[in-house]
Amino acid sequence: MQIIPESPEVDLDKLLEKVKEVIKDYGEYYKHEVEPLAFGLKSLIVYFLIPETSFNEEQFLDNIKQIEEVSDAEILMATRA
């Protein structure tokens, strides 16, 4: 999943902790990476494991986007275990 913060000033470590709290309600955090976008803005690429049978992607993304510092979020890829 790619998460784009509202501005370059957003503390990505604190944002990641908030994202992990949302992920906990659905599954398990795996790892993350930070990718530069433009003009000093960086995005979080977050990997997580969620049981396929209980996953509601729309609701999950809505919960991520409700985090104050999040400008946008999208799932980039999904695979089956």
UniProtKB/Swiss-Prot annotation:
Keyword match Cytoplasm: no
Gene3D superfamilies according to UniProt: 3.30.70.60
Gene Ontology MF term list: translation elongation factor activity
Pfam family, one: EF1_GNE
UniProt keyword annotations, A-Z: Elongation factor, Protein biosynthesis
Domain of life the protein comes from: Archaea
Alphabetical list of HAMAP family matching this protein: EF1_beta
Sequence similarity: Belongs to the EF-1-beta/EF-1-delta family.
Protein purpose: Promotes the exchange of GDP for GTP in EF-1-alpha/GDP, thus allowing the regeneration of EF-1-alpha/GTP that could then be used to form the ternary complex EF-1-alpha/GTP/AAtRNA.
Protein name, UniProt field: Elongation factor 1-beta
Gene: ef1b
